[in-house]
């Protein structure tokens, strides 16, 4: 079974029913049913989104716990320095995390699943667009 590292936006879209890309993400996931990996960065993205949206902290943690309880879930610690994330092509601060996630996925011989076409344009074969 293929494992993909879900970026934060994919994780949010899969778990938040009223997210603009929820149906797209769920349809993509159900078609291929890959194993999805999360890491502290992507899990933090989900928690920040939920809490900023007004979800109580305990409820946000329960959502994350539900994701982590699935058979298709894999957790990857981000025990890797940013120095190994090749920042080639990075032109702005928002791309630094993308570079790190790609490096983490590559370390696990996998790719990043994303809704971000810019990430796919920059990292090509190291990423997969969710559509």
Task: For every predicted segment, state its role.
Residues 1-38, 50-62:
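Short, well-structured N-terminal submotif of metal-dependent ribonuclease cores
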Residues 7, 38, 94-95, 116, ...:
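Histidine- and aromatic-rich ligand-binding microenvironments
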Residues 10, 42, 81, 118-119:
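Alpha-helix capping/helix-boundary segments
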Residues 32, 123-124:
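Short, structured coil segments at secondary-structure junctions
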Residues 70-117:
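Active-site neighborhoods of divalent-metal-dependent phosphate/nucleic-acid chemistry enzymes
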Residues 124-131:
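Active-site regions of enzymes building and remodeling cell-envelope glycoconjugates
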């Amino acid at each position: 079974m293929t494992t993909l590292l879900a970026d934060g936006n994919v994780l949010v879209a899969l778990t938040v029913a009223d997210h603009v890309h929820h149906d797209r993400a769920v349809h993509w996931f159900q078609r291929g049913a890959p194993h999805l990996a999360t890491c502290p960065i992507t899990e933090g993205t989900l928690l920040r989104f939920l809490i900023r949206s007004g979800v109580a902290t305990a409820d946000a943690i329960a959502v994350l716990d539900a994701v982590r309880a699935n058979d298709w879930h894999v957790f990857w610690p981000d025990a890797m320095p940013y120095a190994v994330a090749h920042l080639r092509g990075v032109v702005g601060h928002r791309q630094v995390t993308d570079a790190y996630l790609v490096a983490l996925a590559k370390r696990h011989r996998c790719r990043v699943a994303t809704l971000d076409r810019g990430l796919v344009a920059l990292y090509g074969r190291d990423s997969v667009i969710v559509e």
